[in-house]
Amino acid sequence: MDGILAAVPSAVCVSLRISCRNLDNAESIYHFPGKSLNRVSVLQTGNYVSRKGNSLLKNRHCGEISRVIVKSAASSVGNAEDYAEETATSVKFKRSVTLPGCSSPLSLLGTGFREKKFAIIGVKVYAAGYYVNESILSGLSAWTGRSADEIQRDSSLFVSIFQAQAEKSLQIVLVRDVDGKTFWDALDEAISPRIKSPSSEDTTALSTFRGIFQNRPLNKGSVILLTWINTSNMLVSVSSGGLPTNVDATIESGNVTSALFDVFFGDSPVSPTLKSSVANQLAMTLV
């Protein structure tokens, strides 16, 4: 409890003292004409009270205000530590999540957003958060001490992350209404050119992927999880709001899963802000 109280901003405490002091002042201001000695508290809503009763009521009320403010402030401090905000879209991502199909919790490594250009106007479509199993970081010691710029330009680091035999996931949160077919067409437009000679396995995987979004409205707040279980298998989960709890489909194609990873972390990522954020976090972590 002491730690929680210590975390309450001083401005809140000052505000609390001022609020209770104002109750004292209010007692000398709010009274009935001709009966200046019979003061009535501004807290009173219908019944007269004595000055003694009024004092007790005021003290109890101030105590209740104190408890509520402390509880609220402590809760806000705790909640703020549990989330990271993607500032361009104001979407908040949990720092640690347990996702469907994953064997252990994943940790947030970076956030960004996807912007689509219409003529010269950029329209934000979704925010994205990238999560990894923390065991992946132990395999990146070769990049210890590198700057964020060096990490971002080094494609071999991101290849190492993709090839690591541990789960990683991309959480996409729509910030505007999008038709499912439109979303898939944009994704397929980025994936297909990265697969030079699609095999029957690739074609089947792309068909499965497409089927998830056909005739499916993706309203603002919808969440899509793209979870790489390994280099050849990826889970896709969709919900209309909040983290999905079930797996909608499994994509079984190494070419498709690697192409999708390259869409976000290759040399020409669809969300430069996401890749930059991940690089910055890695630079701070790999020290």
UniProtKB/Swiss-Prot annotation:
**Free-text tissue specificity from the UniProt record:** Expressed in developing cotyledons, young seedlings, roots, seeds, embryos, macrospores, preanthesis and tapetum. Restricted to developing and reproductive tissues.
Q: What is its main location?
A: plastid
Species source reads Arabidopsis thaliana
Question: Can you list the GO cellular component terms from the UniProt entry?
Answer: chloroplast; chloroplast stroma
Note the InterPro entries from the entry: Chalcone_isomerase, Chalcone_isomerase_3-sand, Chalcone_isomerase_bundle_sf, Chalcone_isomerase_sf
The similarity annotation says:
Belongs to the chalcone isomerase family.
Q: What is the taxonomic lineage of the source species?
A: Eukaryota, Viridiplantae, Streptophyta, Embryophyta, Tracheophyta
Supply the alphabetized keyword list: Acetylation, Chloroplast, Plastid, Transit peptide
Transit peptide, start-end? 1-72
Give the protein's function. Fatty-acid-binding protein. Interacts with most fatty acids tested and has maximal relative affinity for C16:0.
Q: What is this protein called?
A: Fatty-acid-binding protein 3, chloroplastic
Q: Which Gene3D superfamilies match?
A: 1.10.890.20, 3.50.70.10
Q: Where does hexadecanoate bind?
A: 114, 126
- One GO term of the biological process aspect: fatty acid metabolic process
Which parts of the sequence carry N-acetylalanine? 73
Where in the cell is the protein located? Plastid, Chloroplast stroma
- Ranges in a coiled coil: none
